[in-house]
């Protein structure tokens, strides 16, 4: 069984046992989270597509940990003017393991 969920402005295709990194969610390691914005649920030829979400669809997951991604370096400059600006950014993420999918 698989599902397409929406979290953090992105969509993910997940099945039970998958480990994925999503945008930061509240919760410590070991906590349980529920994704109720399920866009599609499928098993073999039986597919339910939501409009926009599947009624009663739910995906549960366990939080494995919080972290920060690799640093992205940003630079801007103007030629011949001795103007340079450097900045860096590390996006926060939450690593989750999918524990259950229910079609509702």
From Swiss-Prot:
The keyword Thylakoid does not apply. One of its GO terms (cellular component) is ribonucleoprotein complex. One of its GO terms (molecular function) is rRNA binding. PROSITE patterns: RIBOSOMAL_L21 (PS01169). Keywords: Ribonucleoprotein, Ribosomal protein, RNA-binding, rRNA-binding. Disulfide bonds: none annotated. It comes from the Bacteria. Pfam families: Ribosomal_L21p. The keyword Ribonucleoprotein applies. GO terms for biological process: translation. Belongs to the bacterial ribosomal protein bL21 family. This protein binds to 23S rRNA in the presence of protein L20. Part of the 50S ribosomal subunit. Contacts protein L20. This is Large ribosomal subunit protein bL21.
